[in-house]
Amino acid sequence: MFSTTLINTFSLGLLAVVSVVAAPGGISVGPISIGPGGISLGPGGISIGPGGINLGPGGGPGAINAGPAAVNLGTAGNYAILAKSGISTVPESIISGNIGVSPISTTAFTGFSETLDSTGKFATSQQVVGELFAASFAAPTPTTLTTAVSDMQTAFNDATGRVTPDFTNLGGGELGGLVLTPGLYKWTGAVSVNSTGVTIAGTPLDHFIFQIPATLGFAAASRVTLVGGIPASNIVWAATSVVTAGAGSHIEGVVLAKTAVTLETGATMNGRILAQTFVALQSATVIG
C-alpha cells in the first residue's frame, strides 16, 4: 500500500514541472499514471492495460487499429444483397438479411416466388430470412432504395479510389495459400483464389480493402478463412468486373462489384453483395 506523498521537481530551460504522486491507486507522473489498470498517458492518449494497447480515443481497448480506414456503406449496409438490374436464385438458396433491387421493379426478382405484404412496401420469400424490396413497391420503399443504391456507389468509389496501397500485385493476383495482414491491397489485373484458399488475419478493429480492376474469382471448394477475430464487415472486395464464387466455395467480406456477381451451386458467403448490375445465386447461401 502506497502512502500519499507528493514530490515536486523544478528545473529551468525547456523542461517543465513534473509532479510524482504515490497514492493507493498507483503512481502518477504529471499526465502519466501507473495503477492497477495499467499505464495511461493523458486523457484520450495511449493506455496500456490488461486488455492490450489503446491508441487514442478511437482505437478501443484491446488492440491497435491496423489497415485503412473503414469503407462507409451507408444505408446499403442494411441489405445482404443489393443490385440495380436484378437478383435471381436457383432454388433453394438461403439468404439471411434483406435484399433489394433498384431502380427496377419486382420483376427483377427471379426464382423467389415472393409474396407482397399487405402494406405493399415489401415482399417475403421462403428463401429469404428478411424482406425483399423493389423500386415498384409502395412508399417509402422507392426513396429508401434510391438512397441505398447511391450509398453503394459512393462506397465503391471510396474503396476503389484509395491511394498509397500497402501491397501491390501481391502473388501476381493469385491469393491461394497466402495469409493476409491488414492493409490496402491493389492489383493491376484479375485476382483469384485457388482451391487452397486464403487466410485473412486481423483483430476486430483491423480493416482490409482489396482493389481489383478486373475479374475476381474464387475456385470451386476454395475458402476465405478469418483468424484473430476480424469480422467479415471489415473486409471489402472492390472489383470493377465480374465476381464469381465457384461451386462449394466460401467467401467472407463485403463484395462491392461494378458489374455482376455469381455464386455457383453450394457456394456460401458471410457478408454482403452490393452489385451495380446483377446477382445470381445457384442454390447458394448468403448470411448478411
UniProtKB/Swiss-Prot annotation:
InterPro entries: Ice-bd_prot. GO terms for cellular component: extracellular region. Residues 1-22 form the signal peptide. Glycans are attached at N194. A motif (Ice-binding site motif (T-A/G-X-T/N) 3) lies at residues 196-199. A motif (Ice-binding site motif (T-A/G-X-T/N) 2) lies at residues 154-157. Coiled coil: none annotated. A motif (Ice-binding site motif (T-A/G-X-T/N) 1) lies at residues 75-78. It is found in: Secreted. The record marks T110, S192, T265, A280 as: Ice-binding. It comes from the Eukaryota. Keywords: Glycoprotein, Secreted, Signal. A motif (Ice-binding site motif (T-A/G-X-T/N) 4) lies at residues 265-268. Disulfide bonds: none annotated. The keyword Signal applies. The keyword Glycoprotein applies. Belongs to the ice-binding protein family. Binds ice crystals and most probably inhibits their growth in order to prevent cell damage from extracellular ice. This is Ice-binding protein.
